[in-house]
Amino acid sequence: MVEKKALSYELNQDMLALIRQEFDVEELANRFCEAVAGKSKQQIENIGKEIFAQYGRELMRRTVQLGEEYPDRTYEVLKEAVDHLDGYYKFALVPQRFLEIAYSSIFELRNLPIMENSPRRLAYRITDCPIYQALAAKCGGEVAKLMACKHICLTAVDVLHQDLDLDAIVRMEASLPKDGYCQFSASKLL
């Protein structure tokens, strides 16, 4: 008798732990704070863009790689639906899955707050950001409020859509210092 493979609808915890270990938030904050010590606002922005964009790019590419290596039943069904409908639901359902993996890993979120998911737009919100908190604690509140860390999320979302061959405009719609949360969106280009 052939034993059936157990189906899991949850993200693999080993995968999440591996990403969390490889993309340690405290190490990132330390590296950034050392690099910007004594620098002007413009220099902080430039250094932040370089450091954080690289982190976001590498995070998302590793997330997609591991997400494919550790599929769950939810993802398998999602891919079947996308294939069955000739890719119609690829935007924004597939990107959402990889964003959930990335944020669940580094932020240890149970759920990523999705504000909108439609065939034309994906928007999500971050209310409690450990990267922003680490920057405020290590570099000071004024440096954190410059929001150089936004380049992590903007780059991650942009790279994700590019690598999935989805044309999208990526925006930051809200920021923690101004709005009390960060919100990012990807809008499908027609």
Question: Which residues are covered by each model-predicted region?
Answer:
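N-terminal accessory segment detector
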Residues: 1-151, 167-181, 189-190
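Conserved ATPase active-site switch/coordination loops adjacent to the nucleotide-binding site
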Residues: 164
